[in-house]
């Protein structure tokens, strides 16, 4: 019952569930296989169009490591991790909208991936920010009720992470079905082998569904009212309580 009284925890959990709607990442391999020519990197390239999906993940994901290293600075600039998460998602939204309009024709694909990578730098600190907010919610509930709920809180976090992954995978599968996707192997070229719906929608789904998910992710965060001043007050009072308890026990 304490979990359902923990508004901060519930709002961040809801944000994570809404973030799971960004299933485009699960469609990246399909996009590169069926929409990019096998000789995109040159006729004698050892990496075909399908191998570009690995390059995509590196270019769009690796820059996030910089954000991870700068997590504390991002928190300071944004005056707390809740605001930081909102800024992170906003950067992702702007980057993906820009990448969508850049497109993937010819060399534009490289620019689109680079833009997504740059916009994703702050997102590298997202996991750190979420964990910090979960810890804040535990402290807040202890301050409010006198009881700590680390075990059940992080158990809940793990469970909902699995649920989120299931939602993402399920939506990707549904999208492929609606696009009339048919697996094809052994073709000399895969361009033009899928339905018109697939060719039309696979790019916007890959690029824009994470942006939509980021927008939805922001909404629950707007209802978290926990300022750095409140956090400092809670930490100070908890420290005083624990010191008083320790002195009584000794």
Residues of each region from the PLM?
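Membrane-embedded alpha-helical bundles of multi-pass transporters/translocases
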Residues: 1-250
């Amino acid at each position: 019952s304490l979990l359902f009284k923990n508004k901060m925890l519930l709002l961040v959990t809801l944000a994570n569930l809404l973030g799971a709607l960004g299933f485009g990442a699960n469609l990246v391999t399909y996009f590169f296989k069926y929409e990019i020519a096998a000789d995109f990197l040159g006729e004698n390239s050892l990496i075909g169009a399908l191998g570009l999906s690995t390059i995509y993940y590196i270019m769009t994901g690796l820059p996030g490591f910089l954000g991870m290293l700068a997590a504390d600075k991002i928190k300071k600039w944004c005056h707390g991790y809740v605001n930081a998460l909102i800024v992170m998602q906003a950067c992702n939204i702007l980057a993906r909208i820009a990448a969508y309009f850049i497109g993937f024709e010819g060399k534009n694909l490289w620019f689109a991936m680079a833009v997504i990578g740059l916009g994703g730098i702050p997102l590298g600190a997202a996991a750190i920010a979420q964990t910090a907010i979960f810890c804040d919610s535990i402290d807040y509930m202890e301050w409010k009720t006198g009881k700590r709920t680390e075990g059940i809180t992080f158990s809940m976090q793990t469970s909902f992470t699995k649920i989120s992954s299931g939602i993402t995978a399920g939506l990707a599968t549904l999208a492929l079905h609606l696009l009339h996707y048919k697996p094809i192997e052994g073709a000399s070229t895969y361009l033009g082998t899928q339905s018109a719906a697939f060719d039309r929608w696979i790019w916007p789904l890959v690029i824009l569904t994470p942006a939509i998910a980021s927008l939805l992710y922001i909404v629950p965060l707007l209802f978290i009212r926990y300022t750095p001043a409140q956090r400092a007050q809670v930490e100070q009072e908890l420290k005083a309580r624990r010191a008083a308890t320790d002195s009584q026990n000794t």
